[in-house]
Amino acid sequence: GLGDVYKRQQMNKSIIFSGFGGQGILFAGKLIAYCGMIEEREVSWIPSYGPEMRGGTANCSVNISDAPISSPLFVNPDYLIIMNSPSYRRFIDKVKSDGKAFIDSSMIEEKCEREDIQSYYVPATALAEKNGIAGMANIILCGKLLKETGIIDIESVESALKKIIPASKETLVGLNLKALDIGMKI
């Protein structure tokens, strides 16, 4: 109905994904951005490549909007997915008031003191290892993001994974969906 159309028009969310290079940070951001494209929204995905990439901290910024994105660069995200302590320290204070932070509590011991945001502590790295999908903590956190924000439809994820993952590695599609499901159930 018209109400739904109106609600959709108001969607304009920004997300920062951050962690060590090698934790699949850029992939997670690309996946969410791709889902936005499948849903015919405006999206931007800006990876930060820099001296910190190898072994250091990698991050990317994603916008998903129903209106044209005037500037894909932002400082204060609505949502934050963080997978290491340096990222936690760098970004936790930048989340918008009323925003949400998704924290890999297997990797980050800090607890958020802010009362104006919602923090979700997900032992994503431990859960991935326990479920035989080591290296997919990033997607477990994406599942939790979807569950708590509804930013994209779960159905879009399978289509996006099939586009992003090369055919030679298509077994990874099912493993990613398993990781997503674990995150959605937490």
Predicted regions: what they are:
Residues 1-6:
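Short, small-residue-biased leader/transition segments that mark boundaries at the very start
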Residues 10-186:
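Active-site cofactor/cluster-binding pocket
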